[in-house]
């Protein structure tokens, strides 16, 4: 088994980002908005704040309700000291999610989720960075399980645009195991812990778990020596934080030039 560890790679990227921040006339600032009752993303929120502190970037947190979030986004859009804005999903009121994401200034949408955004979605960007760093060849049949806005859909869209053969699976897929067994490279990002079982993965496959906060791979998959596989935690997660701050630094350079 080959583990696709992202922690060390993210550490190298962090040092590069620290040097880039030191070279800026004004350090960028990141604003994170989350719902009052959303504690599911606290692990990644802590990772983002720690990363920002390590590279010299202030990270401000705003806890909002469905009634206050759009006003907060508008204020942050107009605040010239704020370089990037993240909406920490999920929001407590799903009906406000589309409105909130659409309200973010595309020039500050460093998560890459707003319509017309200037940036590549952070988790797909991180996922492909991780594979490239480990010299994983994306040749072959790619299967993406989950078509959510954070990972599955933008990842599949990017792979298709790059000419890869991609099968998309979601809740409407009738025989998921049959689909995943065709994958040379299998990505999963559904939010369902333990979804992918050993008998759903072909011999020698590459398996990438983007699930958060809990992994989507059955622990027994890590007993298979034939697989190339991401750990969780320590795989895509640290790389996603690095990709997010990479987008923030791009935004900083754009705003200061």
Segments (PLM) and residue ranges:
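N-terminal glycine-rich anion-binding loops that anchor highly charged ligand groups
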Residues: 21-31, 35-53
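Short beta-strand elements in bilobed, periplasmic/extracellular small-molecule ligand-binding domains
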Residues: 49-64, 166-169
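Short glycine-rich anion-binding loops that position phosphate/pyrophosphate groups of nucleotides
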Residues: 87-94, 150, 191-194, 213, ...
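Rossmann-fold NAD(P)-binding glycine/threonine-rich loop
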Residues: 98-111, 208-256
């Amino acid at each position: 088994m080959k583990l696709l560890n992202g922690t060390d790679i993210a550490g190298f990227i962090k040092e590069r980002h620290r040097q880039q921040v030191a070279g800026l006339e004004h350090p960028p600032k990141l604003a994170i908005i989350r719902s009052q009752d959303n504690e599911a993303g606290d692990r990644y929120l802590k990772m983002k704040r720690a990363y920002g502190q390590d590279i010299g970037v202030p990270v401000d947190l705003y806890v909002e309700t469905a009634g206050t979030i759009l006003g907060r986004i508008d204020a942050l859009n107009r605040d010239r000291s704020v370089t990037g804005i993240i909406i920490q999903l999920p929001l407590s009121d799903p009906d406000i999610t589309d409105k909130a994401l659409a309200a973010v200034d595309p020039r500050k949408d460093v998560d890459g989720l707003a319509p017309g955004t200037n940036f590549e979605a952070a988790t797909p960007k991180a996922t492909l960075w991780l594979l490239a760093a480990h010299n994983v060849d994306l040749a072959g049949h790619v299967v993406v399980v989950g078509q959510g806005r954070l990972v599955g859909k933008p990842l599949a869209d990017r792979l298709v645009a790059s000419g890869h053969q991609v099968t998309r699976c979601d809740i409407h897929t009738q025989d998921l195991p049959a689909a995943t067994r065709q994958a040379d490279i299998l990505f999963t990002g559904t939010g369902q812990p333990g979804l992918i079982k050993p008998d759903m993965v072909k011999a020698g496959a590459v398996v990438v778990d983007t699930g958060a906060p809990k992994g989507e791979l059955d622990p027994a998959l890590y007993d298979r020596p034939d697989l190339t596989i991401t750990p969780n935690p320590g795989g895509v997660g640290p790389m996603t934080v690095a990709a997010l701050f990479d987008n923030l630094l791009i935004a900083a350079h754009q705003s200061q030039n």
